[in-house]
């Protein structure tokens, strides 16, 4: 699976994996998978991570007992998630649906509601955090093209 990633992406995955491999045994706790993937800028929830992990370990890429995963399994999961990620243009087009006035601005509450009820659903807390990032002045509105840039730069 890693073959579909650029060398830069593989290097970034290695860097993140090594940060979480605190005892340097070549494995990270499966429970840290969500946090590690989010460190790569990937929006992933616990259920999705469990599915990815089950697929990776079933195909021989991980599980050494104790719920730990090796770099190959992590890279497999990261590659799968990264390939599913949307581009800036695709994200902007999705948010454009909420912009009836075609002003480039959408209500922050509408964005929050969309994040907790559609697609890869966020928790209320995660959605609140994203809205705070998107609307740092607390004006109740989000310039969605800038929000997309924030999302894409989290990688």
Swiss-Prot record:
Signal peptide: none annotated. One of its GO terms (cellular component) is cytoplasm. Ca(2+) binds at residues 21, 23, 25, 27, 32. SUPFAM superfamilies: EF-hand. Gene3D superfamilies: EF-hand (1.10.238.10). Residues 8-43, 86-121, 122-155 form the EF-hand domain. The keyword Calcium applies. Keywords: Calcium, Metal-binding, Repeat. One of its GO terms (molecular function) is enzyme regulator activity. CDD domains: EFh. Potential calcium sensor. PANTHER family: EF-HAND DOMAIN-CONTAINING PROTEIN, MYOSIN LIGHT CHAIN 1, 3. This is Probable calcium-binding protein CML9. It comes from Oryza sativa subsp. japonica.
């Amino acid at each position: 699976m890693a073959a579909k990633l650029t060398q830069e992406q593989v290097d970034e995955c290695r860097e993140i994996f090594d940060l979480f491999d605190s005892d340097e045994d070549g494995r990270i706790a499966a429970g840290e998978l969500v946090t590690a993937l989010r460190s790569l800028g990937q929006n992933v929830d616990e259920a999705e991570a469990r599915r990815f992990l089950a697929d990776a370990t079933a195909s021989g890429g991980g599980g050494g007992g104790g719920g730990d995963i090796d770099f190959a399994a992590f890279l497999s999961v990261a590659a799968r998630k990264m390939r599913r990620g949307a581009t800036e243009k695709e994200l902007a087009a999705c948010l454009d649906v909420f912009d009836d006035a075609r002003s480039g601005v959408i209500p922050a509450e509408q964005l929050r509601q969309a994040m907790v009820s559609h697609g890869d659903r966020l928790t209320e807390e995660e959605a609140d955090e994203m809205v705070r990032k998107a609307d740092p002045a607390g004006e109740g509105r989000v310039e969605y093209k800038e929000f997309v840039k924030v999302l894409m730069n989290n990688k």
